[in-house]
Amino acid sequence: MSNEVTIYFDRPMSFEPNNIQPLNGITGLYFIFSQTIDIQYPFDKSKLLYIGMSERKTNSIGSRLLGHFDGKSKNLGLTNYRKVEPLLFTYINFEMLKNIWQFRIEDLESYFILDFVEQYGVYPICNNKSGFEIQNKTLTSSFKIDWKYFK
């Protein structure tokens, strides 16, 4: 592992269409989380509900988030948490990491999910997939992820 980069998240945004629309055409990772509900994971509490990604500009962060917002993604967990309280989101533009991450966005998502599992003991509560793909890669970068952001 040659270089460690600390990942800090941008300010939280309200999970609503007027904040989602400007993200059309942007690829990367996005994080949906609660404003006040602490999820008790095995190792610690977090407000993080979901880690997602967009790998193509035609299926951008904006369109993926809109799919979660209007229920088209069929993620019942996110839909039901949103019924209880307004949610927040933040994102990482993949363009910002291209110089230090040599693999696909899918692998970056797997890295983040597996790192969350290591810190909290299980996948984010609304994620339904695993992140095993990255385990077969030889990594030249590692990320120290600021999971405290979601506390």
Task: Give short role names for the model-derived ranges.
Residues M1-K151:
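Boundary/linker segments flanking structured domains
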